[in-house]
Swiss-Prot record:
<dbReference type="InterPro" id="IPR020630">
    <property type="entry name" value="THF_DH/CycHdrlase_cat_dom"/>
</dbReference>
<dbReference type="InterPro" id="IPR020631">
    <property type="entry name" value="THF_DH/CycHdrlase_NAD-bd_dom"/>
</dbReference>
<keyword id="KW-0378">Hydrolase</keyword>
<comment type="subunit">
    <text>Homodimer.</text>
</comment>
<dbReference type="GO" id="GO:0005829">
    <property type="term" value="C:cytosol"/>
</dbReference>
<keyword id="KW-0658">Purine biosynthesis</keyword>
<dbReference type="InterPro" id="IPR000672">
    <property type="entry name" value="THF_DH/CycHdrlase"/>
</dbReference>
<feature type="binding site">
    <location>
        <position position="186"/>
    </location>
    <ligand>
        <name>NADP(+)</name>
    </ligand>
</feature>
<dbReference type="GO" id="GO:0006164">
    <property type="term" value="P:purine nucleotide biosynthetic process"/>
</dbReference>
<dbReference type="GO" id="GO:0004488">
    <property type="term" value="F:methylenetetrahydrofolate dehydrogenase (NADP+) activity"/>
</dbReference>
<dbReference type="GO" id="GO:0009086">
    <property type="term" value="P:methionine biosynthetic process"/>
</dbReference>
<keyword id="KW-0368">Histidine biosynthesis</keyword>
<keyword id="KW-0554">One-carbon metabolism</keyword>
<dbReference type="GO" id="GO:0035999">
    <property type="term" value="P:tetrahydrofolate interconversion"/>
</dbReference>
<comment type="similarity">
    <text>Belongs to the tetrahydrofolate dehydrogenase/cyclohydrolase family.</text>
</comment>
<dbReference type="GO" id="GO:0000105">
    <property type="term" value="P:L-histidine biosynthetic process"/>
</dbReference>
<dbReference type="InterPro" id="IPR046346">
    <property type="entry name" value="Aminoacid_DH-like_N_sf"/>
</dbReference>
Length: 275
């Protein structure tokens, strides 16, 4: 079984990002990412610290805006950053204040600055095959598969999870690579049987160790998007101990999709700045 090391892939991406940042610096541009923290949520703050560390490594500016949980303050902040030419990329962390949805907030982010694919227009453009930033986690799934040289054209892919953040955009990205995609969810009957037919299994349901050996055909590639905190620590949606003897390749948790996601956010910011 091949372990798909997201940390080493992220480091490779980071080196190319540094090159692009240095090239932009010759034109007087510093790619800058604005991160909005709408509420005092510790999990969100923890992730933002990861983004800040990554940005510092590659030379991307990162401005964090910590808010009080007031909906009007959030929309005003997003509108101000959207109009600021010094801001090239924007992300808004969840949870959001009561009364606001991700679609409400995302619609206020210009598509050109929407480096995490939060604007519904970005998802629509993705569905139509038009240029747009995909949600970084979904893009990380494809990045890992491509870097691991996993054949996608004609492959059978099973995406377990249908969120607009991971499942749906990951399915669209796989379709764009000519994979044959099945999207499963909580109402899917005989999930294990459906998943077992796939060459590629993407687990993105937010349920610890839900995907077991019975879901995976011998030699299949398994991408574990899950990040679940349990008494035993951080675990994915895949029971890695059970699946590893069966799978041909598997992303670890931690150290798989997460590091690639962070670096893609920064790469998107550089691209939004003209890099």
């Amino acid at each position: 079984m091949r372990l798909l090391d997201g940390r080493s892939m992220a480091a490779d991406i980071g080196r190319s990002v540094v090159d692009d940042v240095e090239r932009l610096a010759t034109t007087g541009v510093t790619p800058t990412l604005a991160v909005v923290l709408p509420t005092a949520d510790e999990a969100a703050r923890s992730y933002v610290r990861v983004i800040e560390r990554g940005a510092a490594k590659v030379g991307v500016g990162c401005a964090v805006h910590e808010l009080t949980g007031d909906p009007d303050e959030l929309t005003a902040t997003v509108d101000r950053l959207a109009a600021d030419p010094a801001v090239h990329g924007m992300i808004v962390q969840t949870p959001l204040p009561d009364g606001l949805t991700a679609a409400d907030v995302g619609a206020r982010i210009p598509v050109g600055k929407d480096v995490d694919g939060m604007n519904p227009l970005s998802l629509g453009r993705l569905a139509l095959g038009l240029p747009a930033f995909a949600p970084a986690t979904a893009a990380a799934v494809l990045e890992i598969l491509n870097r691991a040289a996993v054949p996608l054209a004609g492959a059978r892919a099973c995406v377990i999870g249908r969120s607009s953040v991971v499942g749906k955009p990951a399915a669209l990205l796989l379709l764009a690579e000519d994979a044959t995609v099945t999207v499963c969810h909580s109402r899917t009957k005989d999930l294990a049987t459906v998943a077992h037919d796939a060459d590629i299994v993407v687990a993105a349901v937010g349920r610890p160790k839900m995907v077991g050996a019975g879901h995976v055909r011998p030699g299949a590639v398994v991408i574990d998007v899950g990040t679940n905190w349990t008494d035993a620590g951080l675990v994915g949606d895949v029971d890695a101990d059970a699946v590893a003897p069966v799978a041909g390749a598997l992303t670890p948790v931690p150290g798989g999709v997460g590091p690639v996601t962070t670096m893609l956010l920064l790469r998107n910011t550089v691209r939004a700045a003209g890099g």
